[in-house]
Amino acid sequence: MKLYKADAIVLRARDCGEGDKILTLYSREHGRIKAMAHGVSKPTSRKRGAVQPFTRSRFLLRRGRELDTVSQCEGVETFPFLRESLERIGYASYVAELVEALTPEGEPNESLFFLLLDVLRLLAGGDAEMLARAFELKVAALLGYCPVLERCSHCQGALAGPLFFSSSLGGAVCGLCVAFAANPVEVNKGTLEILKALLNWPLARIGLLRVNRRFRNRIRLILRQYLTYHLERDLKSYAFLDRFGQAPAGSGAADV
């Protein structure tokens, strides 16, 4: 069977049998991979640290009919700070679940790999909630369904009058076209400006945004509906993340 190498981030590790785990990886070279790691749960396993969720590791894998098998692995980055708070680990779990849900197996996207790596690094001390919102938009853009925010997504005209966001129409909607939208969410220009900043600013600058709780809740609603529309299902992480939805908004250095 063919051996291959992968620089990959562990999205999920599920127990399987005595001492084994089934890993879901997102790799730079091969995209999403599912692989069996034998004996890694045993206390004496040298591979144990390299297969923990949210760890970047170098893998040597053997191709199989149904599942590939981990032959060797070595941890590169472990992001220990993620395990220091429930909020950080919750958002790390969410971005990992989102990548797993949105990507097919075996289709590499190097930009997505590095975006995931960046957000895991920035969760150390950044605004986890806004980093997650920016990640959602940037992933959608990378995968080809970026929401339209500069004009009406239905008539392509200027955004004037009452403004809305429609998942079914693919973005912002003007007051004249809202009748064509299913379950539109009313927004204002401030909300759209924040969405544009989250989409266009580098992740490292997202901490400069000062966004109050009202805007955060509206943006969370919009993007959750948008992703659910494309995924056609809810993500398991939502229920856990809702526990942090009423946390005080972090202060920053720039208004939008």
Swiss-Prot record:
GO terms for cellular component: bacterial nucleoid. Keywords: DNA damage, DNA recombination, DNA repair. It comes from the Bacteria. GO terms for biological process: DNA recombination; double-strand break repair. Involved in DNA repair and RecF pathway recombination. Belongs to the RecO family. NCBIfam families: reco. This is DNA repair protein RecO. It comes from Pelotomaculum thermopropionicum (strain DSM 13744 / JCM 10971 / SI).
